[in-house]
Amino acid sequence: MITYFTPEKIDRIEDNEIFVFGSNANGNHYGGAARVAFDKFGAEWGVGEGLTGNAYAIPTLDKNMEKVTKLKLVRSFIKFIEFANENDSKKFYLTKVGCGIAGWTIEEVKEILWVAAKACFLECKLPSNIVIPEEFCFSNPELYKLELERGILIKRAKMAVTDEELEMIHNQILDNESSINILKGDLTE
C-alpha cells in the first residue's frame, strides 16, 4: 500500500523507514518531533543534522536556539533530498519540520522544500521514497498522488524480470498518465 502523505502522528516505523524531524543545531531533542525521534526512533543526543538512529534531523534552529536562515534551511533540505535519493530502499516520513517550536509557517517551509527539490532535480519533484505532509503539497493533492504512483511504477518497470511483468507495468503507467492528463485538464478548466 502506498502512503501518500505523512500521518499526523507516527508512533512506530519499520526498519527501512526513517522519521524526519526538525532539530536544533545542538542536537538537544527536548520537545516536539525531536523528542519523538529521541524517545521512539533512536535519535542520538548531540546529533543536530543527518541520519541518527531511524531518524533524520534537519536543523531549523541554530546553536543559540534562533531560527536558521532560509538559505541554511534550503541547504539542509538539499542534503536531506540527496541523502534520500541515494538511499532509495528506505522510506522517509517528513514531518512538518520547523513548524512547531522553531516557529516557521507551513507556507515558508513548503516553499523552502520545493526550492530545494528544484535545486536537486531542476524541476519541482521529490524522490518517490519521501513522504510529505499534505500541507507541503505543491500541487493538487490528487495530482501529487498520481505523480508519486507514476514514479513508483517507473522504478518497478526498471526492475521487471519478465516481458509479461514489464508489459503489465507499462499498461499501468499508461493508465496513470491518462489519469494525470484528465486531472490536469480538470484543473485548467
How should each PLM-predicted stretch be described?
Residues M1-L146, I152-L153, G185, E189:
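Macrodomain-like recognition of ADP-ribose-binding/processing modules
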Residues L148-R150, E165, I169, S178:
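Generic short amphipathic/hydrophobic targeting helices enriched at N-termini
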Residues K155-M168:
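Charged, low-complexity interaction regions
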Residues A157, L174-E189:
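Amphipathic alpha-helical coiled-coil segments
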